[in-house]
Amino acid sequence: MKRLTLVLILTTLYACGGGGGGSTLEAEVQSVNQPEVAEECAPDCFLQTSDVNQVVAQAVAEASARGEAATIAVVDRVGNVLAVYQMTGADDFVTITSTFDAGGTIVGGLESLNFIPATLAAISKAITGAYLSTSGNAFTTRTASQIIQENFNPGERNVPSGPLFGVQFSQLPCSDFSQRASDTVSTGPFRAPLGLSADPGGFPLYKEGIAVGGVGVIADGIYGLDKNLNDFDTDIDELIAVAAMQGYAAPTEIRADQVTIVGKTARFSDSFSDELISSPSDAQSLEALSANGTGNLIAVQGYFDGDRTRSGTVFGNPESGIRPADPTVFSDSNGNSLDAFIFVDENNNNRYPARGATDTPGGLTTNAMTAAEVQTLLNEAINVANLSRAQIRVPVGTQARVTISVVDTNGKILGMGRTRDGPIFGADVSLQKARTATFFSGTGRLSGTAPAELLRGVPATRYLSPVPQPVDPTTLVANLAVLDSPAPTISGYVDALQEFLGVRDALEATGAVVAFADRSGGNLSRPNYPDGPDNGPPGPLSKPPGEWSVFSVGLQLDLVYNAIINHVAFVLGVPVPDVPQNCTGNTGFADPAFQQVNAFENLANGMQIFPGSVPIFRGDILIGGIGVSGDGVDQDDMISFLGVHRTGEQLNTGLGNAPQELRADRIAIPNQTSRLRYVSCPQLPFIDSSQTEVCDGL
């Protein structure tokens, strides 16, 4: 991967031109419009087979012109895989690494695994481009790379981590929320085989300004990320993907480089349309490409049958799995429609209507949340979102767009809802957040199993080592081996947490109740505590230098690592079943291999470690949690926190936020002057109000 050091910022490139000559801005504007698409499609735009064929063919044309061989995937907005194409000579496998450009060695986690199918990398990149983007923002895998690393921006020192630190381990193949592909295009949202991707070369696709899907390309054999934002890369994956999206590119005014996050400009791409050496007119039909030996559609077990390209779904119609909700159910306290949306199955039934809990918080069934309370929580949170100013959407002043999930103390989904045009990634993530806050607030549980006991029952994480190069599919399984070191155990994180906090019974059934919001748990999951200064110790749920990377983050990955490897083995054709729809309790590459032992629903789709959730209490009794995701993390915090507070005020049933004296920010951590954070709300959050500090004192 060659680096081209530039001192010009992206806006200067747009204004003055860069790359292959002419005006960069003019070329980018032209990339948005597809002359061949004559019929207007708005508002019901979707990717037709002709669109999918064109996107793939344009990628192949650019790769061929550069003498490269690529693997290309196209998905619709909810993750239906519409095409996977592999050029002759393309690498069958990629290596996961965060150190390809930066040097150094990281041992453990997913680092250095070199037997990952290139098809899975391409699919995850395409899904990332689709899931992070909406009609108000267009983010790419390069944007993802920028916002998930240990410092924001990457390459800077002594600054906090990225706002979406940890989001890469969402949409997991073992998620109990994400759908699984069938023989036909069907209702989503669907899983991503490797979670979300930070490897440049994944872009959203648009028609008439409407987000309709994503494209992912892998050609360099490396599944990595960009650790330095002080330059612009020449990245072959990204260049080919830029060619693929010609005519289907995001409107320039909503691209990531038009969005600021805590005062820093997001990055959309380091490659531009005027750098291409092919044009859309060079694209040949897939039949012609097959006939001349350039490449073919390829089957990917669990995702795509390889027979033919497919049309996508119309987002917002029942066929997509997301549709408008009943306005008489999702309404504010005055009966006004909240313009909410819900997730539906293939029969157009709401997958997650509000329902009463069946747990017994504090040993009493009367403490369990009722269906009416759950619906009010969803409505109040959506109402707060509709009143709030978005962080990552254009134009400034747009409403926040999010997904909300409510769970009981066992992690069972009690209800989900979303606002119009919220990014898809927020669905699975909001559920992760709700479950994580609830789970880690379970110290002193009088009913059910305490978190420490559940974690101690999880099988050990079985890190694998890379296999000899070049990877031979016929001997791959025989060459797989478990690393001797590091060899983490999940129970080790429990011990580390208790020691770090100075609370020996934290997470235990006998301990005093402590309420952890996701912001609190996220503080404990950073490679340095407190988040930012690089001379602090690793958080107890993180890892030390030499072991930590975005592909080896600590408990968040180790809890689901075995399940991810189970899925990779299944796709590779190893004679094992696909991973169950529960990310916990997988034995991994052990004897017996890929079995489930002591699985639990509390974290069934994995845990999340960036802000946007709070536990829900009735008095001083934990009764569940709420998670919000889709916009800025401070907005997510506020929507969840105020949603619970306003529900409590409206219903007067004792439901509310955790009492202040129980919150994690009250813990005095030994040898630390910085306390955990609970929630952080925007200073001036509402569109039509000058109200400030809206969460203070609550």
Language-model-detected regions and their locations in the chain:
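Bacterial signal peptide processing site
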Residues: 17-21
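N-terminal non-cleavable signal-anchor helices
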Residues: 8-10, 209
